[in-house]
């Protein structure tokens, strides 16, 4: 509390700091730009933007290190006891996301029987 010689005491409002993890990729940059640049109401919070690749964010989420974070949807099965999914903010779509790379072409039916290597540990 402070008194600026006005004859009354004014309580200083301190913003609550929250860590917000997301990737530096263009889709996340677009989603968080307004918040990062102070162009939208922050709701009285002070967000510390943590920019890291999605695997690192998955690992940090598994340890509960960040208040809010982007994760891969697969990782949610491992961290659902620590975090809740928000109703918006997903970055998914047809033709977007992981690609299957092979030396030769395969049909969808053939792909179902193949062993596929996936990056990351989750």
Regions found by a protein language model. Name each.
Residues 48-59:
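Short helix-initiation/N-cap motifs at beta->coil->alpha
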Residues 53-55, 64-77:
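Beta->alpha turn/N-cap motifs
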């Amino acid at each position: 509390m402070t008194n600026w010689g006005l004859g009354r005491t004014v309580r200083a409002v301190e913003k609550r700091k929250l860590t917000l993890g997301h990737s530096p990729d263009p889709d996340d940059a677009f989603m968080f730009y307004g918040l990062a640049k102070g162009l939208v109401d922050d709701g009285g919070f002070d967000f510390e933007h943590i920019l890291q690749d999605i695997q690192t964010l998955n690992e940090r989420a598994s340890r509960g290190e960040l208040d809010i974070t982007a994760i891969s949807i697969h990782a949610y099965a491992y961290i659902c006891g620590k975090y809740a999914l928000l109703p918006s903010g997903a970055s998914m779509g047809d033709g977007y996301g992981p690609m299957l790379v092979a030396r030769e072409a395969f049909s969808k039916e053939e792909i179902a029987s193949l062993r596929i290597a996936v990056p990351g540990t989750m």
